[in-house]
């Protein structure tokens, strides 16, 4: 399960985008109390160093098997951002699986993954701060979700 950290408006925009694609009926945002537990935190240089290492291992493995390396892609022609993160997802999953195997701790070694995603246009000319950037948390172990809530000013949950 994926969550935006403190990003109500961005989460709502995502839900509205899903509605426009016919993937959901009613957009809404649900908050969650999350205990990060053993977190693979992509804002920590240890984690990004691991990703670089395991990317090399994955690339070598795919090359030996004659498989292409996945690529991050735009969702639609004309999109500025590479929203379809096939490469990032493959590297993260390979890295986490291999770290668990290498340490003998099994799949549950990392319960959550936390990272910054830079998206949108620059906030002002010359900026490296972008209009749709957000922190996202992937919860791999549902036990890390301690509870749910409706954010202040948010939509109500329908009875359907």
Regions found by a protein language model. Name each.
Residues 27-160:
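Active-site and NAD+-binding cores of ADP-ribose-processing enzymes
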Residues 1-18:
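Extended catalytic/binding region for NAD+/ADP-ribose chemistry, centered on the ART fold
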Residues 18-29:
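Cytochrome P450 catalytic domain signature, combining two hallmark sequence patches
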């Amino acid at each position: 399960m994926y969550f935006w950290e403190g990003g109500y408006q961005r989460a709502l925009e995502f839900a509205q985008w899903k509605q426009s694609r016919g993937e959901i009926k009613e957009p809404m945002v649900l908050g969650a109390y999350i205990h990060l537990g053993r977190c693979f935190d992509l804002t920590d240089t240890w984690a990004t160093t691991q990703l670089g290492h395991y990317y090399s291992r994955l690339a070598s493995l795919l090359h030996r098997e004659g498989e292409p390396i996945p690529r991050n892609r735009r969702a639609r022609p004309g999109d500025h951002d590479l929203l379809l993160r096939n490469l990032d997802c493959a590297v993260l999953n390979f890295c986490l699986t291999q770290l668990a195997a290498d340490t003998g701790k099994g799949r549950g070694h990392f319960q959550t993954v936390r990272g910054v995603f830079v998206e949108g246009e620059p906030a002002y000319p010359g900026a490296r701060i972008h209009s749709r950037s957000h922190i996202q948390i992937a919860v791999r172990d549902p036990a890390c979700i301690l509870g749910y809530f409706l954010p202040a000013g948010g939509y109500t949950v329908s009875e359907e």
